[in-house]
Amino acid sequence: FALGACAGPSRLPVDAGFGADPQLPPPRQTLIPTVKIAPAVGWPAGAAPVAAEGLGVQAFADGLDHPRWLYRLPNGDVLVAETNKPTPPPTVRRGLREWVMDKVMARAGAGVPSPDRITLLRDADDDGVAELKTPFLTGLHSPFGMALAGDRLFIANADAVVAVPYRSGQTRIDVTPVRVADLPAGRNHHWTKSLVASPDGSRLYVGVGSNSNVGEYGLDEEVDRAAILEIDPATGARRVYASGLRNPVGMDWSPDDGRLWVAVNERDEIGHDLVPDYMTAVQPGGFYGWPWSYWGRNVDRRPPPDPAMVARAVRPDYALGAHTASLGLAFSQG
């Protein structure tokens, strides 16, 4: 991992990469991403993360196998996707970068087979601890995002959106999921597929990450990737709702104006202080720069140039710091 030191130490204070106008130092290209591997350990007894004023943190459930995403059903039950990346197809070539990433992920506790299931957690007495933990839906394919629309529960697998019938209070679903729409798969550099339904349930929105850092495998590998896709759940038809978002993960609807917001993981290998991850309101049809530019129209020199695309790039709303891997996003309505 000595190659990771080629970028040198960070030159900016941590808060310089946050806010509506983050500092953007000159890029310093490196061979592999900036990494600092934290050991995967639990919280000791009596300890917990420190929350912002007015909020608290406590353990809701434990003993889960690689939990990655949560979804709260209207009756208060919580679904958790126990999941990991799918096995890559044998046709996918894997080089030094992939080898390093596998080692990094394994050390961080992520080098395990995917459990491929959704587990239900229920806190019936409302004491902040789930007393029921039970398998809810199994036999999936690296599931991640979940969304309820009407009487159907939609799940974003690594390669498709699927659906099952749902009735309030169910603790297990045994029917075979119905395929609603295919999703970009293949190499699956970013395999997680986040999912939200429109407030009226008539459309689904899927966050699909890029298949690379900055398009190094060719743009043929990036069709309908680095984008939010809009899907008609009745027909399975899909279109690109917004693009140029390297890895759009957490999504939520603003209760104030109804706009869709997203948290985005940006690119690597141009220094510790670049590029800031961000959250932003999503402009329908908007293009957010990837891979040709970042934070609006700051040109990334690594991909083949495309000035016309750079000129279209929308500047995001709020930076969240470089390499923070910002994932979840939720509006508080309390």
Which residues make up each language-model segment?
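Asp-box/WD-like beta-propeller blade repeats and closely related beta-sheet repeat scaffolds
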Residues: 129-152, 157-199, 210-213
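Residue-level detector of Asp-centered blade-edge/turn motifs that repeat once per structural unit
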Residues: 73-76, 148-151, 197-201, 254-257, ...
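C-terminal motif of bacterial Sec signal peptides marking the signal peptidase cleavage site
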Residues: 3-5
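Residue position within the beta-strands of beta-propeller blades
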Residues: 79-81, 155-156, 205-207, 261-264
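Surface loop/turn motifs at the tips and blade-to-blade linkers of beta-strand repeat domains
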Residues: 59-64, 134-141, 180-187, 240-245, ...
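Short loop/turn segments immediately following beta-strands, especially the blade-tip
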Residues: 121-126, 164-172, 282-289
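Beta-propeller domain segments
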Residues: 7-51, 87-109, 113-115, 192, ...
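Conserved beta-strand position repeated once per blade in WD40 beta-propeller domains
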Residues: 66-69, 145, 194, 250, ...
